[in-house]
């Protein structure tokens, strides 16, 4: 019998609960759904389990508040922490969420030190740095989910603007998960044609592209303001799970993720969003793209915005 993969989800809120359902519905492995509020974790796990006869899910799902239950997990997705409310920035969450991540990291180090860890908690680039600091896991095994989601939003807005299938659009977003993120127009394409060339072909204006870039930067905020309570969870859940899937199944997808840089892009000792290849060894390669001077300036502004917050951890 082939042993199923074990996927632990730390935080049973909207994103954690959605990921638990997606893992089960796609038969990606057994699930441990952990939350400090054990009742929420157990209730959602039971609800998902009871859907299996109808949805034909296989595998086990456990709801718990005991970190010992994550022992031996192959992959862990961390969504624990408070989420944004209308009027809040991602950075407003730092003080509370750093303490949450510290506790999570120490328990991951104790019970699942060989796991591949994806951090979703905001402010993302600071929380993934805290995870690395307090867990002492190798840097190639700790990543943050940012660019996959940001690229998905950018791709969706471009597809809607051009009235094409989202399957035709591919995009790359660099930098921090915030106002200084950098969607790269020349490396983003529709049907293999770069968006920069689409502008030259008069299929979309540069002004409209700039508006879409700004809309992408504000994508999470727009959803927060519409929901009033809580933040986005469908797209973040899909994005985090894609990263875990690439690791567990050695798909070697090139994805934009917040990873620890050791001189790439001129950055040292920070987690910043860049394209990487994720395979069975975690982050297997950082892809260094050629940037224009303007792009370098925006990227460096993004790096500086992250570095200013590092003292908080």
From Swiss-Prot:
Example GO BP: lactate metabolic process
Organism, as annotated: Ehrlichia chaffeensis (strain ATCC CRL-10679 / Arkansas)
Reactions accelerated catalytically: (S)-malate + NAD(+) = oxaloacetate + NADH + H(+)
Pfam families hit by this protein: Ldh_1_C, Ldh_1_N
EC number from the UniProt entry: 1.1.1.37
UniProt keyword list: NAD, Oxidoreductase, Tricarboxylic acid cycle
Keyword rRNA-binding: no
Name of the protein in question: Malate dehydrogenase
Binding residues annotated for NAD(+), in chain numbering: 11-16, 35, 97, 120-122
Biological function: Catalyzes the reversible oxidation of malate to oxaloacetate.
Family, similarity comment: Belongs to the LDH/MDH superfamily. MDH type 3 family.
